[in-house]
Amino acid sequence: MNYTFNEQVTKILRKNGWYPDRFININNYRRILEEKNYYLNQGAEKFFNNLGGLIITHEAYSDINDTDVSEFNPMKPAAWLDPKWVKECYEDIIKEKLCPVGVGFSEHMVFFVSESGGFYGGYDDYFCLIGDNIESDLLNLFNNHNFISLN
């Protein structure tokens, strides 16, 4: 049930309140997503159980000497985005359902987990793959910044 993060990611997560075997109750997230007609897939559920509620300060995308913040909960993106728009603009590209799991980059980018466990970012018409799985995603999000544009 737990992820296996590398040392870099583990250090950043621990500094921001995460700990091994973390498991939180996500009933509130589940309720919010259901109300907004989002599908809570298994990958997103695992993500929320282990990382939900964390606000992570990490290296900025545009300047390694600056910091950025990623917030892992679905409340803001579920309130901001219409699931029909997400389907038309993002899901149709990857042919999978997406669950919003947080925001980052000054709250400009919304993070999603797909049914297959991929981690994606969307900002208006821009849509990208951040990682094929959560472990590679967080390393890429926090340090490498090699996002793959999909549109």
Q: Can you say where each PLM-predicted feature lies in the sequence?
A:
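A surface-exposed partner-binding patch
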Residues: 1-108, 149
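Short acidic-glycine loop/turn motifs at beta-strand connectors
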Residues: 113-116
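Short, compact, well-ordered microdomains
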Residues: 119-126
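Compact, glycine/acidic-enriched structural inserts
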Residues: 127-151
